[in-house]
Amino acid sequence: MAEGEESKKMNLQTSYFDVVGICCSSEVSIVGNVLRQVDGVKEFSVIVPSRTVIVVHDTFLISPLQIVKALNQARLEASVRPYGETSLKSQWPSPFAIVSGVLLVLSFFKYFYSPLEWLAIVAVVAGVFPILAKAVASVTRFRLDINALTLIAVIATLCMQDFTEAATIVFLFSVADWLESSAAHKASIVMSSLMSLAPRKAVIADTGLEVDVDEVGINTVVSVKAGESIPIDGVVVDGSCDVDEKTLTGESFPVSKQRESTVMAATINLNGYIKVKTTALARDCVVAKMTKLVEEAQKSQTKTQRFIDKCSRYYTPAVVVSAACFAVIPVLLKVQDLSHWFHLALVVLVSGCPCGLILSTPVATFCALTKAATSGFLIKTGDCLETLAKIKIVAFDKTGTITKAEFMVSDFRSLSPSINLHKLLNWVSSIECKSSHPMAAALIDYAISVSVEPKPDIVENFQNFPGEGVYGRIDGQDIYIGNKRIAQRAGCLTDNVPDIEATMKRGKTIGYIYMGAKLTGSFNLLDGCRYGVAQALKELKSLGIQTAMLTGDNQDAAMSTQEQLENALDIVHSELLPQDKARIIDDFKIQGPTMMVGDGLNDAPALAKADIGISMGISGSALATETGDIILMSNDIRKIPKGMRLAKRSHKKVIENVVLSVSIKGAIMVLGFVGYPLVWAAVLADAGTCLLVILNSMILLRDEREAVSTCYRSSTSSPVKLEEDEVEDLEVGLLQKSEETSKKSCCSGCCSGPKDNQQK
């Protein structure tokens, strides 16, 4: 696929190629040897399961067609993949295979007319040319692949005057190879659909001209009509609409966008007209990074794959030597029935190609990674996928992960008679303007709502203390804002902190304001749980996974969250510093493989310590995204158990593929040893095993069959299905109308349990 990801200074372009000649990982070195000798190729990578080669090259030195020519000189059957190809081409077998098959069928009529037997030889000649070309290319590189082994089997059967079997070998091998290529191409279509999400054209709002997205710079205003895809990441500067973000986040419901809302490339404007000011170049958009991440993951090898590849290096030589022994030793011993032993040697020889076994892991991994990516669950490496299937403990951060991080100030007070509330709020909001914590935005919004204008320019020496709070110097005063621990930072003994928490119970997050060592103010913050958290925790428990919550918030706030989740969490730790979270993760890892889910700076050490770290891609900080092994593209925690089930299914498919590839070849060899050495069956088993492995792995690309939920939530006019006695409670999770209504709850628990004290 000639993809327009160019660097003007270096004239670089990324091109994608379908390379049918890649059967398994053993061909990767062949591709490498070819491309390293081509002038202008800067870097390349090979994705074996989809038979894809990705090449970054200088367009002034070499074109995609010249790269195709170089690959085809090695008989790799390469072609340029059109950009974002998403349709499956109906392709017939090669003319060689068709002619060979017709002649083979006609040769079976030899029992009625004996001269037709010679048509089998013609069938061999007609169909053997593609096999011969690939076999010669393989031998010249001092390798014995399945084409070379099959050619040896064909020549040997011809020498034994078994013409019909020779023709059968050629025809079955050609058809199986065609079916295998078609299946691999079908698997690659899903990956191609990811790359074609973002449109290639954008309309400049000022002029109405349509230009290539690669020519659109940052801060350019583009227009997007209803029904069109947003071309580049940006911010809405005019208009409003509903946007379908399912392609990136997996979120089924439209998201409302107004002025200053962030929008992403490849999402669809469902209604309305908007103008978007771009905030990134096309190559730096979320969808581009997402595609790159998936490609990198698919190129990576799992531990299982590395082990199988290592074993396969010794498998083929050992089998070839064994086949030679079965052919030579009977001759030396002057055994009478040499034909049987020669056929047995050929069966063993054809079984010497371990392609099916080598493909068993990467194809399943490829399909699982692709399916996860299309669901908004980005897994960075194959090893992460393997580890994900073995997780025993999942730890969650609270703020921004379990809860929405949409704080609301419920109480702000000055505790010093000499400082009025207006002045204190001005100090706090000015300092918080320099912080990226979700609580900071709530304090700023509260200040603006009471007509206090933050002035970040007056803040000096701003400092952030993870797990504690922030500091800033204003008007010659040292101001500290944070939780209990900030008191020690301010020089105030915690024992001297007034017990103001008694009036701030019921799960509210409490903040303190110090001027020097003196406590001068306090505030309360309210936060609610995300939709679906309780349901996700129950699903994890059904998978036999233990859940925990790690938070730097106070004990009351932590226990209030636990109550909202109907005590779904197994373990709750509160008032933790970032290093405390990392230490607890170490303790969990002693019990079993551990996963950490977080979204902020305070989670980075714990994410790094865990066997698997999941960062929230939409709400998460840049550091958390880099630290995490998996990126959750939306804030829907329910994708985590879904991703874990996919990982377990992938692990199961790998085992099935290994058993399938070994057992089929084993069965053919057993038949040979007990007196039925069928060479054509051995050829069919070898090529057929690869096909079965691919088809079995492609089951992972299907949607997982899920039970119909009793409760549905929608941001549009979609129907809501509740139990009959709960029809009135249509605003589950919002402020309840009465005490009677508040006692009712959503039947599935997807709205996070009891709804007491939740805010609209």
From Swiss-Prot:
Entry membrane topology: Multi-pass membrane protein
* Protein's UniProt keywords contain Cell membrane: no
**Which EC class, in a word?**
translocase
- An example of a Gene Ontology BP annotation on this entry? detoxification of cadmium ion
Report the main location listed first in the record.
membrane
Which of the residues are on side Extracellular? 112-114, 163, 334-341, 675-678
Molecular function terms from GO: ATP binding; ATP hydrolysis activity; metal ion binding; P-type cadmium transporter activity; P-type zinc transporter activity
Q: Where are the transmembrane segments?
A: 90-111, 115-134, 142-162, 164-184, 311-333, 342-359, 655-674, 679-698
Catalysed reaction, written as an equation: Zn(2+)(in) + ATP + H2O = Zn(2+)(out) + ADP + phosphate + H(+); Cd(2+)(in) + ATP + H2O = Cd(2+)(out) + ADP + phosphate + H(+)
Q: Which UniProt keywords apply?
A: ATP-binding, Cadmium, Magnesium, Membrane, Metal-binding, Nucleotide-binding, Translocase, Transmembrane, Transmembrane helix, Vacuole, Zinc
Question: Residue ranges of region Disordered?
Answer: 739-760
Q: Which ranges make up the Cytoplasmic topological domains here?
A: 1-89, 135-141, 185-310, 360-654, 699-760
Induction note: Not induced by cadmium or zinc treatments.
The record's section on InterPro entries has: ATPase_P-typ_cyto_dom_N, ATPase_P-typ_P_site, ATPase_P-typ_TM_dom_sf, ATPase_P-typ_transduc_dom_A_sf, Cation_Transport_ATPase_IB, HAD-like_sf, HAD_sf, HMA_dom
Where do the HMA domain residues begin and end? 13-79
Tell me one Pfam family matched here.
E1-E2_ATPase
Indicate the residues that form the catalytic site. Answer: D397 (4-aspartylphosphate intermediate)
Give Gene Ontology CC terms.
vacuolar membrane
- Determine the domain of life of the protein's source: Eukaryota
Where in the body, by tissue, does this protein show up? Roots, stems, leaves and flowers.
Q: What is its EC number?
A: 7.2.2.12, 7.2.2.21
Cysteine-cysteine disulfides: none
Briefly, what is this protein's role? In a heterologous system, involved in cadmium and lead transport, but not in zinc transport. May have a detoxification function through a vacuolar sequestration.
NCBIfam families tied to this protein: ATPase-IB_hvy, ATPase_P-type
Q: Indicate the family of this protein.
A: Belongs to the cation transport ATPase (P-type) (TC 3.A.3) family. Type IB subfamily.
Question: Per its record, how is this protein called by name?
Answer: Cadmium/zinc-transporting ATPase HMA3
Organism this protein belongs to: Arabidopsis thaliana (Mouse-ear cress)
